[in-house]
């Protein structure tokens, strides 16, 4: 039995509407909004833990839970986070599909229409490159929202509103302040996204093979394979790239002190040790694994269903 046969996915008739940008943008937006809203507390705790080596998870959680409005405080920064992740995911998935489709057409590869994936199948190198390029492009566009989100979530600042945070950043640092930490963000996101897509596609093939080799069991559904593959891929890619995330957080919180990536790394290691580069790793793995698994599963399922629906209309 082939790997594709284990996926419980209907045959899709390829039509012009199958590759519509609107499908990928809408599916990416919905998947990003869903994961960001559900997992905002983990993102907020990660920011608080990473802002200083002296901050640890349990005291941070206790402090928030003992505050007058613990639920509200756990979801503090949800709006900028939802905007950043929602529209960032929409831009990312749209760009990723465009890049991968372009490579398929350029190389004359026949598109795969009977698998669990909404994306064309490419080589490992192409998976790495397209994932990295799409993520950096989306990250640059959404960078101002990211900076405002990090400042608003942190307890270093006493911003009462998102507008106030943005206005203060522009007033004290200029528009350049809205792009603080972009170098570290790109250095984190490019390898993370590239590795993620690479691991994700490889894991899906492996899980499909394991499922097909067990003839006495019911084949795994595409959504199950996508979810497990997404979580495992995120865990691996997150561990490898966490130092860049820790540096990025410091640069966005205190750009005047840390200045640039190299200076930030040097100061962090001198003052807090190498361990500071892996601050918030547990929280980041938890959030990334869940958010990536959820976002990619929702995205792929929405695209596959959209293609089935529009493909049948085109008959």
Swiss-Prot record:
The keyword Thylakoid does not apply. One of its GO terms (cellular component) is mitochondrial inner membrane. The keyword Repeat applies. It comes from the Eukaryota. Gene3D superfamilies: Mitochondrial carrier domain. Pfam families: Mito_carr. GO terms for biological process: glycine import into mitochondrion; heme biosynthetic process. The chain crosses the membrane at residues 25-50, 77-103, 128-153, 181-204, 225-251, 280-298. Keywords: Membrane, Mitochondrion, Mitochondrion inner membrane, Repeat, Transmembrane, Transmembrane helix, Transport. Solcar repeats lie at residues 19-102, 125-206, 221-305. It is a multi-pass membrane protein. Belongs to the mitochondrial carrier (TC 2.A.29) family. SLC25A38 subfamily. This is Mitochondrial glycine transporter. It comes from Aspergillus niger (strain ATCC MYA-4892 / CBS 513.88 / FGSC A1513).
